[in-house]
Amino acid sequence: MDYKSGLIPDGNAMENLEKQLICPICLEMFTKPVVILPCQHNLCRKCANDIFQAANPYWTNRGGSVSMSGGRFRCPSCRHEVIMDRHGVYGLQRNLLVENIIDIYKQECSSRPLQKGSHPMCKEHEDEKINIYCLTCEVPTCSLCKVFGAHQACEVAPLQSIFQGQKTELSNCISMLVAGNDRVQTIISQLEDSCRVTKENSHQVKEELSHKFDALYAILDEKKSELLQRITQEQEEKLDFIEALILQYREQLEKSTKLVETAIQSLDEPGGATFLLSAKPLIKSIVEASKGCQLGKTEQGFENMDYFTLNLEHIAEALRAIDFGTDEEEEFTEEEEEEDQEEGVSTEGHQ
């Protein structure tokens, strides 16, 4: 039994393995040396250097003017930001395991027979492999198409030369796109910062506005309490005066009532001598009591409190006119009015 053959992966496994060994930049199998990023993704060192240089165009090393500061770029697979020191990509660790796997894979592929159909065949000449590139039509084709077929009058070139050129062009495009993605990510970060700062500034001005209105509420409440206190004081003074008058009139009423009772009792006295003895003083007291009825009175409208009314329409209008940026406009308007008044005074003086 061939135990070794059982260790060799089948075709599908080899294809899956090959996909894992493809560089996301050049889209080819990793070229040694292979470097591993902090995010655990792998790149050819050359490809890593290409995107690093594209993202940091002013950073040079290995023969150029050495920049003492590092740079950064983003992993093309996961967009994780990779921060470099002054050594650049040469400071990244090599992935020797991946390099060994590549060697084993290549050795296994070289020992396997070439599968039928692994090389693209010409559609016009099914037995011919595609081995040249038509520069005129910009399509790959076979030699028979150039000699006998549709591309006789076209300019062609070896497939390998065009292959290498377009690979290089595609790699450059990828590097340019990755650098562009980094710039877009930078813009996104700046816009996110703008959102954050906008929210912070909005919160700050809201707080300031709330404090200013709270101060206005406090002034209004203080003024309201002051004016209500003045009304209450006036009310108490008037009530004290009225209650004092009521007390005086009640005392007078009580005296008059007693005199009336005494006078009625005197009228019931049957004896003339007895009646005459008390009648004269009683009449005198009644006359004096009648004169005492001329006590103080309240003036007409004494109860009126209308003089405490307020006209707050102009203040209400000023409150309704509150808006952002009106302070400078009002100051400018007041300055204009003062200038107009000064001009009017100077004109009258000349006349």
From Swiss-Prot:
Coiled-coil residues: 189-269
Q: Where are the zinc fingers (RING-type)?
A: 23-79
Swiss-Prot/TrEMBL catalytic activity? S-ubiquitinyl-[E2 ubiquitin-conjugating enzyme]-L-cysteine + [acceptor protein]-L-lysine = [E2 ubiquitin-conjugating enzyme]-L-cysteine + N(6)-ubiquitinyl-[acceptor protein]-L-lysine
Q: What induces it?
A: By interleukin-1, dexamethasone, lipolysaccharide and indinavir. Up-regulated upon muscle denervation, immobilization and unweighting and more generally upon muscle atrophy. Up-regulated upon sepsis. Down-regulated upon aging.
Give a GO cellular-component term.
Z disc
Q: State where composition is biased (Acidic residues).
A: 326-345
Enzyme Commission number(s): 2.3.2.27
Q: Which Pfam families match?
A: zf-B_box (PF00643), zf-RING_UBOX (PF13445)
Task: List the residue ranges of the region (Interaction with TTN).
Answer: 74-218
What is the residue range of the signal peptide feature? none
For the region Disordered, give the residue spans.
Answer: 326-351
**Tissue specificity of this protein:** Muscle specific. Selectively expressed in heart and skeletal muscle.
Q: In which pathway does it act?
A: Protein modification; protein ubiquitination
Where does this one sit in the cell? Answer: Cytoplasm; Nucleus; Cytoplasm, Myofibril, Sarcomere, M line; Cytoplasm, Myofibril, Sarcomere, Z line
Q: Quote the function comment for this protein.
A: E3 ubiquitin ligase. Mediates the ubiquitination and subsequent proteasomal degradation of CKM, GMEB1 and HIBADH. Regulates the proteasomal degradation of muscle proteins under amino acid starvation, where muscle protein is catabolized to provide other organs with amino acids. Inhibits de novo skeletal muscle protein synthesis under amino acid starvation. Regulates proteasomal degradation of cardiac troponin I/TNNI3 and probably of other sarcomeric-associated proteins. May play a role in striated muscle atrophy and hypertrophy by regulating an anti-hypertrophic PKC-mediated signaling pathway.
Quaternary context:
Homodimer. Homooligomer and heterooligomer. Interacts with SUMO2, titin/TTN and GMEB1. Interacts with TRIM54 and probably with TRIM55 and TNNI3. Forms a ternary complex with RACK1 and PRKCE. Interacts with CKM.
Spell out the protein name for this chain.
E3 ubiquitin-protein ligase TRIM63
Species source reads Rattus norvegicus (Rat)
